[in-house]
Amino acid sequence: MSLPERPGGISSEHRNAYRQSQSRRHRPADIEASSYYPVEGGRSSRHQPGLSANSFAETIPSPNNSFVENMPLSPTGERPAAPDQPFQRKRSLIRPERNRIDKDHPNYHYRKHAANMSTMPSATGNDPIAEDIEATTDVSGSRSQTLDGVSDTSPPRGHGSRPNSGEQEKKAPRSSAKRVSRHKSGKITKSTKKRSTPQEVIRPPSFWNVYCAIITFWCPDFMLKCFGMRSRAEQRAWREKMGLISLILLIMGCVGFITFGFTAVVCGSPPLRMRVNKVSDGYMIFHGTAYDLTRSGHPPAEGIPVPRGQRGANILWGMPGVDNRGKDGSFLFQNVNGRCKGLIEAAPNSEVPTNANGDLAWYFPCTTFNQDGKSEPNFTTPYYTGYSCHTSEKSRNAFYIDLKKSADVYFTWDDIKNSSRNLIVYSGNVLDLDLLHWFDSRQVTIPQRFEELRDTNTAANKAFRGRDVTRPFQSNGDKEIAECFEEIIKVGSIDTVTVGCIASRVVLYVFLALILSVVGSRFVLALIFQWFISRNYAAAKTSQSSDKRKRNQQIEDWSNDIYQAPARITGDIGSSVVTSDRSSKRGSTFMTTSRFSTVYGPDRGSSNKRVPTTMASSGGSGSQLLHPNSMYRQGNDSRSSFLRSDPYASNVPPSDGPGPAGFIHEAVVPQPPADWMPYGFPLAHTICLVTAYSEGAMGIRTTFDSIATTDYPNSHKVIIAICDGIIKGHGEEMATPDYVLAMMKDQTMAPEDVQPFSYVAVASGSKRHNMAKVYCGFYDYGAKSAIPVDKQQRVPMMLVVKCGTPDEATKSKPGNRGKRDSQIILMSFLQKIMFDERMTELEYEMFNGLWKVTGISPDFYECVLMVDADTKVFPDSLTHMLSAMVKDPEIMGLCGETKIANKRDSWVSAIQVFEYFISHHLAKSFESVFGGVTCLPGCFCMYRIKAPKGAQNYWVPILANPDVVEHYSENVVDTLHKKNLLLLGEDRYLSTLMLRTFPKRKQVFVPQAVCKTTVPDTFMVLLSQRRRWINSTIHNLMELVLVRDLCGTFCFSMQFIVFVELMGTLVLPAAIAFTFYVVIMSIVSKPVQVIPLILLALILGLPAVLIVITAHSWSYLVWMMIYLFSLPVWNFVLPVYAFWKFDDFSWGDTRKTAGETTKKAGLEYEGEFDSSKITMKRWAEFERERRSKANYWGSKENVVGGGNSWSMPPGHQYHDDYYSDA
């Protein structure tokens, strides 16, 4: 894979400046999707990192490149030697060219950019290896779809002598003579529009669409039309919503079945069981089963009178002279003539009745005995022989048929092994061998084996007593005897668990262990991150207090009011940081500085510690942000130029020509040396992006004040505000862009002279064409600012106002395309700078505007801080965030903690305080250990634009990566899944895209970076906000769960955590319902379900432990209690409402504008996109055209800055005291 070059590096490849997006192949009229072919004799652009001094391949000869051409704007050409060591790729088991790269590959679009670069011939004379470009890059198969008049062309260029130039002229692109520039093409003709219309391709319905159709078969389209869903898009969204709800209900049902139903199915309802010796007096035992005889009545018999008024005497306590309560009456109803037939026979002269078949009437004396086995044999017979033996058919039917058993009597193994009992276990039945002593030898004869087993002194008895004899009895021929014993001496059953109950317990404990491991690991790893890992990201020193507890208290006090200023507002970076260093208590007695010392402090370059790489430090000397021969040079090519008293002294009079250097603002903040590190790390240039919609003046002012007064040097930060249309907030006097424009001063151009420029918006239909104005200047704190005048720093600022096309000037919300479009304006701009691609007029103006107010090329910016217009940043937050970015190049995105400023406004805002706290310090801290924070809040986060790669001055795009920009700028949003991703949760989707594209890089949470914001204080606004957040969370987790390259493996992976989080989000309503059920059942029923209660206590109690251990404010314990009482709202009301509103893509009541009742989704755009209205050229072509219009084709001095002809006026100073101690 080709890598963009870092300034000062080599460029081994070149490319054709066109993009062919697979995701946009169905949009042939898309100006950005159309191919670009240079005319004959033209040269393909270079694969450079951007439009820095070393990357203007069309304009400036770069002495660090291997192949340099003579450019029309540069009459000189240099060819220095290339670096000795080329970039070496890491070893891999799979060769990169053998990887299958399809449209689903995370680096698909980036590989296309790399594959589209043409390779220049080698200087050795060897012919390059020609590859089939058509086969490798034209994935969509529509390369010839470029419209005449749509693809812009470069004018013919002159070339110096180089190998095979004649062959290249012969291989010029076909039909290049027919292509004309866009400004000459005019409007697109009808035939052209007809050819550009994408043909509808009939595809078979997907499985998901079929499933949704089956689920909603009962509601045909005409019924949906009756309920207001007239368009097919609305009907399809509703059907997909019902399909998703059905899956959610199915998942909830599965969770409920596993929680409550699985045990009942596989284990069943076990019968009532009673342990031996604990059978109550209301029961009587027969053959190991207890019967409730409290309401029994014995029919009249000899010796058993019938009490008056009753049907019979009670068997338990009504028998004369006998108390049967809790006793064993197995001998009263003996199982005879079964499996014991042939083993037990009548003795000679026996009184036991028998018949011709040898059947006996009874075996034992018909009496009762104690359940503890301590009764002695009793052979006395009252009244008559066979008394109480119940041998009649009526009495036996009354027992075996009519009497219902109440409970099983069970023995534990401790009972079996009791030395006072003579018990064995066979097939789960407990047999009492002592009952064999009740055989009357005068009445029956028994086998010798019976006598061996009952005698405790025999070897057989000692071998089997207290054990399970199932296997030995079945193997040694005693099976017949054992089965006989089961009928006559069974006293109960062993305490065993069925296979189904064992399985249910295994499942229960597996899920319990899983939940406990997830909850416990989240808690432990969150603590590890808070205590050990997070401190590595923070800056060593800032303008705020270094004491952690004191700083936390300052932050809590600061976050109580949205408009409250911090305890300490940082002033000039030179004074705030250097002074704090010199005021150290351990100061040296001897002088450490002199009048010759640099104002930037001690030299950091003498340290042997490896310094992290930044764009400014990668140039070698560390101080040259501009190329010595750059047309942007200011006469300050060395580090000493910052300290000269008259750095712009020149014998040549200044020029007021139209070159970019002639328009650099006189008050631009100077650039310090790259080795100046006031916070202990190299400074990286960053863009502070503020997206505004309908915010008021007060909210915008405090946001800009907080960013402008951050202690990060102003030379390395710039504020870019993008207003999403001409929108007037509800109750506001002016439109939001007017408020922002009033907060700028020293503008490079009068506001009334600023013209709108076209760009390609993220929309569909005619809305795809949009226009915006670019205002450049410096931030104006205002006359009544709360910031002291001596603390007001000069911060460069650029305002982009999306004003819309003239056709929508009279419509509501002109220029409004959404927050995602605002972000794409910057992301696409950064991508085109890094790859030196064709850009729109708006992007060209943005480039020049940034140059004018910062004095450096935009490709030097490495990070983007994204802040909403209602968010206030703590003074040292930006420093901590950039410290993490610089110290760990693998970090591609991070976020800070968001505090709530209106905690006590209402109960709605109060219940959100602790929810915000645990979402950061528990969830994001845990995810940061894996480097996979799944959601970087759009109100306060930072992304890396590009990252250093290797040690050969190479940079790879991160946020500016074509795959990220291409997917994030998707405008064909035709499914419910895409609409929830791109219309409701664009900020979270950007985090998902970054993780999906770069699964091996990190997204972390930096707790030292803090901001504050206002949250909804009415329930309807909260309901609308959380509907969007919950739905976007579900669909983003669906995307992330498919990424297999995230950190970890199987259950110990980030992918598994994402899956658990997805399932947990889907079953929130069922979970809270189950929780209340378990609590209520534990109160009203016995026995108490201990395990679920312990689990519930752990889940709800661990956050409180986190508060105590991490030493946060004790007030959060109160906020936690408020949060616990509001759990039904969080886990039931909000998710259920969000699920039912899956097909609602509006923003509801979150942020209304003047004259608006409810925010619409804004999905259906009419009209066709006319790409001829948008001009796209490379920067050099725009610059050449601008200069040609100005008729400024001067001498060599005017082109390359010879003689400092483009220097600033002699009176302009570089403000050396800006970084001094004064």
Curated annotation (Swiss-Prot):
What biological-process terms (Gene Ontology) are attached? ascospore wall assembly; chitin biosynthetic process; protein localization to bud neck
User: Basic residues: which segments have biased composition?
Assistant: 176-196
Gene Ontology CC annotation, any one = incipient cellular bud site
Q: Which reaction does it catalyse?
A: [(1->4)-N-acetyl-beta-D-glucosaminyl](n) + UDP-N-acetyl-alpha-D-glucosamine = [(1->4)-N-acetyl-beta-D-glucosaminyl](n+1) + UDP + H(+)
Q: Which residues are glycosylated?
A: N64, N116, N378, N418, N636, N1031
Composition-biased stretches (Basic and acidic residues): 94-107, 1213-1222
Instruction: Show the coiled coil region(s).
Output: none
**What family does the database annotate?**
Belongs to the chitin synthase family. Class IV subfamily.
Q: What is this protein called?
A: Chitin synthase 4
According to the record, the residues making up region (Disordered) are 1-108, 136-199, 595-662, 1201-1222
What organism does the UniProt record list as the source?
Verticillium dahliae (strain VdLs.17 / ATCC MYA-4575 / FGSC 10137)
- Specify where it is mainly localized: membrane
Q: Keywords in UniProt for this one? A: Cell membrane, Glycoprotein, Glycosyltransferase, Membrane, Transferase, Transmembrane, Transmembrane helix, Virulence
Where found, per UniProt?
A: Cell membrane
Q: How does it sit in the membrane?
A: Multi-pass membrane protein
GO MF entries: chitin synthase activity
Q: Which InterPro entries match?
A: Chitin_synth (IPR004835), CHS4-like_dom (IPR054295), Cyt_B5-like_heme/steroid-bd (IPR001199), Nucleotide-diphossugar_trans (IPR029044)
What domain of life does the native source organism fall in? Eukaryota
